Amino acid sequence: MSFLQEINLKLDVFEGPLDLLLHLIQKLEIDIYDIPITAVTEQYMSYIHAMQTLELEVAGEYLVMAATLMAIKSQMLLPKQELEIIDDEDFFEEEDPREALVAQLLEYRKFKYAATVLHEKEEERKLYYTKEPMDMDDYKEEDTTLPPNQINTIDLFLAFHAMLEKKKNRQPVETTVASDDVSIEEKISAISERMRQVQKGKAVSFDSFFDSYSKQEIVTTFMALLELMKTGAIYAEQENNYSEILLFNTETQQEDTTEVEETQ
């Protein structure tokens, strides 16, 4: 079994391809009724390619959606035609190839919202007791909405893919496995130590963790960063869709003006 095959990481980021598409639409701040299919397809394929680079299993439904997006993109590139019917002044325009996808997204968003409301009601119901009212403030759920500029693991996947593309342009990524393998646990320990040394109010550039051109080293580092984000030890911020991603130590970070730590 290869090194990458031994990696066992479950990423509960999305419930399916429609969930991923909704995230991308929100991230790109676009109108769901007028989806720029080229931009969305590029972002979607970046996520798929990142998963394949890490040799993580990509569910078939994601690949089906990828094929659907590519088909829609191809149709959108074809010259628009108008079919004349009976009266020369009346025209029947071709159906927008995005129409079926938009309908699916709207339907999914509706049911997702309903599921969220039902879950909130269920959680509220758990706080009801058949005794005298009492202060339940200490038992309220924390707000899980990410603060402004803070990003989640899917954005990190997209940044990871972009970083790999930049490395390919500079020098091919080595695919051989070195004899002195570093485990994910060891890499987590090394990254944690580095983050502990970061002063309050400062951040570390995401790209600064990827000096190596070894595929094993790159993948191990990325897996370690994902695990640290999952456990809440670190968090990531990005000012806008194309700016640098910064990593912060959750324990020591304060609401100060941040500076990017120089690459060590």
Swiss-Prot record:
Principal place where this protein is found? cytoplasm
Q: Which GO terms describe its cellular component?
A: cytoplasm
The record's subcellular location field reads: Cytoplasm
Record InterPro entries:
ScpA (IPR003768), ScpA-like_C (IPR023093)
Name a biological process GO annotation. Answer: DNA replication
TM segment ranges: none
Q: Which UniProt keywords apply?
A: Cell cycle, Cell division, Chromosome partition, Cytoplasm
User: What job does this protein perform?
Assistant: Participates in chromosomal partition during cell division. May act via the formation of a condensin-like complex containing Smc and ScpB that pull DNA away from mid-cell into both cell halves.
Return the NCBIfam families for the record: PRK00104.1-4 (NF000995)
Subunit comment = Component of a cohesin-like complex composed of ScpA, ScpB and the Smc homodimer, in which ScpA and ScpB bind to the head domain of Smc. The presence of the three proteins is required for the association of the complex with DNA.
Q: Please report which protein family the annotation says this sequence is part of.
A: Belongs to the ScpA family.
**The protein, known as:** Segregation and condensation protein A
Q: Which organism is it from?
A: Enterococcus faecalis (strain ATCC 700802 / V583)
Q: Which gene encodes it?
A: scpA
